[in-house]
Amino acid sequence: MGLPEIFINFQTAAVSAITRSTRGALAVVLQDATQGGAAEAVYGSLAEVPEEQFTADSYRLLKLAFLAAPSKVYVLRAGDDGSAVFQALERLPFDWLAAPGLADTEVISFIKSQRANGRGVKAVVANAAGPDCEGIVNLCVSDLVLEDGAMDARSYAVRVAGLLAALPLTRSATYAELAEVVSCAASADPDKDVDAGKLIIVSGRDGFRLGRAVNSLTTLTADKAAPFQKIKIMEGIDLIRADIARAFESGYVGKVPNDYDNKLLLVTAVNAYLKGLEGDVLDKTADNRCAVSLSGQRNWLESQGTDTSDMKDTDILRANTGSQVFLEADLTFCDAMEDLSLMISM
């Protein structure tokens, strides 16, 4: 009933966020014209997949998709009309995309467009030429052989995307085990490849694993600094953005008067949500806090012709801003342990 219910929505979102991050949704686009196969389907497990409706190659990829147990896999078939696939992807609630049935350039363009519109979807492509995007993971590997035979990198992107979709936000994909890999070409310079935004496969005494879990972002700016290159950090950023936007749209838009008191109630709700993410997504030792944005309020007032030079900060914060809500948050995300330096004295 009213605002208390909205507050509960935000707290529920915190619980939902951690649950959802345990097993995310994967979308797979295949080139498969098997008679009787649906153009679009969703499966919760490999047991639900009708093997007879797919080619042997497609079914092999779907087995890889389910290896890490994502919550669900949306399967689409790329036909002559490629726009139909992208229209479907625009409405499907997936987290990660792998599309061996489409050109990587099309996938990269789609993901960049979706992210520019505020949707936190991501994709895994293979051996692409510098996607340079925090939403694109560029799997770079060659001469890949699995237990059941050779496979090209674009097809194996399905396995990696499924792994990333299933991975909880408490973990990084760095050194994630790839038990099905028998061999692959070794990177000539792993450090250089990682710095170039490439996700590589490395080998050790215990088998093959993913290298450092980075996305393809290489051009750093003040708005997108080094943390944006880490897959784990971007998962947290996208999750928080989506959960808060969803709660605001369902509980506030058109329903709550936009005065200062209600802005504070919204801030309180957001802070309660952020508190629930500390320790797994956010650094619990940091002051992760949202507040009404003084600069946002001031800039809006100035754009409306109001001279704020003689206004007190409290007056600016309390000022009427029409339908606009300006908030700001200072967040510190929690990465996973990946590097160790141990000094031993004897």
Predicted segments, located by residue:
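Extracellular Cys-Trp
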Residues: 58-175
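Extended, charged amphipathic alpha-helical segments
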Residues: 163-223
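Intrinsically disordered, low-complexity boundary segments flanking structured domains
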Residues: 12-17, 58-65, 84-85, 186-188, ...
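Generic alpha-helical propensity signal that fires on short helical segments
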Residues: 26-28, 115, 176, 181, ...
